[in-house]
Curated annotation (Swiss-Prot):
Keywords: Cytoplasm, Methyltransferase, S-adenosyl-L-methionine, Transferase, tRNA processing. It comes from Shewanella denitrificans (strain OS217 / ATCC BAA-1090 / DSM 15013). The lineage of its organism: Bacteria, Pseudomonadati, Pseudomonadota, Gammaproteobacteria, Alteromonadales. Belongs to the RNA methyltransferase TrmD family. It is an enzyme of class 2 (transferase). This is tRNA (guanine-N(1)-)-methyltransferase. Homodimer.
């Protein structure tokens, strides 16, 4: 997957290219990331990238010309078909369904805003989609862009090594993940659930599925609004609720 990022702070993206899952993906040629800094497209000796908003008010906006030229440079490098995304609190909220959609793209260009944002006409003429990572305010679009990159990269074939790792992540099937355990078998008087030590793969599968459904029911019940549970899942949920009521 090819990724282009428009940012005033390209150094921040070393967190993507040099470390962890995404760093290995870059090293193995599964992920290609390039950055464009609007400061490199300025024409004054101060490399000015902000400007006052019409109508007054606090704060500044990103200057149109350097930002637009940076986007055009990224588009030229990406070739035809690259989708331009602006990270914005006004955008569609990113969830696993959206991540799956974005992962189908061969190339993405991510525009990271700063200050009070960007000129609306840039959004209208240069941006294909706006995405948000949540209903809160950040200092810029870099952290949301890195969040999007990390979540999308996990779905690129070969990045995780085992596709099952991605399939078992929270939200991959619209549900929260089940609990996980490693050694030692006993920790401060708490034992690993016996079923996980049984070696019975079907029982383990059912336990994990039930725990996933049950955890979603307890912690994020609103997620069920967009789910169509199978007969098996419905039965497991009923058993989980019954067991929970008995232990309460």
């Amino acid at each position: 997957m090819w990724l282009g990022v428009i940012t005033l702070f390209p150094e921040m993206f070393r967190a993507v290219t040099d470390f962890g899952v995404t760093g290995r993906a870059v090293k193995n040629g599964l992920l290609e990331l390039h950055t464009w800094n609007p400061r490199d497209f300025t024409h004054d000796r101060h490399s000015t990238v902000d400007d006052r908003p019409y109508g007054g008010g606090p704060g500044m906006l990103m200057m149109v010309q350097p930002l637009r030229d940076a986007i055009h440079a990224a588009k030229a490098a990406a070739g035809d078909g690259a989708k331009v995304i602006y990270l914005s609190p006004q955008g569609r909220k990113l969830d696993q369904h959206g991540v799956t959609e974005l992962a189908k793209s061969d190339s993405l260009i991510l525009v990271c805003g700063r200050y009070e944002g960007v000129d609306e006409r840039i959004i209208q003429t240069e941006v294909d989609e706006e995405w948000s990572i949540g209903d809160y305010v950040l200092s810029g679009g870099e952290l949301p862009a890195m969040t999007l990159i990390d979540s999308v990269a996990r779905l690129v074939p070969g990045v995780l090594g085992k596709q099952a790792s991605a399939e078992q992540d929270s939200f991959s099937e619209g549900l929260l993940d089940c609990p996980h355990y490693t050694r030692p078998e006993q920790l401060d008087g708490m034992d690993v659930p016996a079923v996980l030590l049984s070696g019975d793969h079907e029982k383990i599968r059912l336990w994990r599925l039930q725990q996933s459904i049950g955890r979603t029911f307890l912690r994020r019940p609103e997620l069920f609004e967009n789910l169509a549970l199978t007969d098996e899942q419905t039965t497991l949920l009923a058993q989980f609720v019954n067991d929970t009521d008995k232990s309460a």
